[in-house]
Amino acid sequence: SPAEWAYERIIVYLKNFEEQLDNEHEVAMGFAGGDAGVLRIEGMGYFDPDVITFYGSEASGAKMQLIQHVSQLNVMLRALPKQLDQPEPNRIGFRLAADLENSVGSVKAKKKKKPR
């Protein structure tokens, strides 16, 4: 589906962006126009066939969620200082990429099983 395709590509971009960050920064999304500000990405998902969602929090800690149709998808990644109360930065791209690889691997493993 278009949503799944976009979801997988965004994960690749998130991971690549995070590979360039030092240990004091983590990835966030910036928004153009208005006072929407910056979303510290804590997760993302999709709803077939055509909706992507990002969720997390803003600088004050208030929860935020962006729900976006794939035809209007624009994502601006930004580096933010990691949260002071965390010893390590949140690497959402690495976590989502690992989850994606595990889910693809489990689907392949299920397909390879022979019926008894």
Annotate each language-model stretch with its function.
Residues S1-G33:
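Negatively charged, low-complexity tracts enriched in Asp/Glu with abundant Ser/Thr
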Residues E4, E19, G37-R40, P115-R116:
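Eukaryotic intrinsically disordered, low-complexity regulatory linkers and tails enriched in Ser/Thr/Pro
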Residues I10, M29-F31, I41, F54, ...:
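Generic structural hydrophobic/aromatic packing signal, biased to beta-strands
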Residues A62-R116:
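Helix-rich interaction surfaces within compact, conserved domain-sized segments
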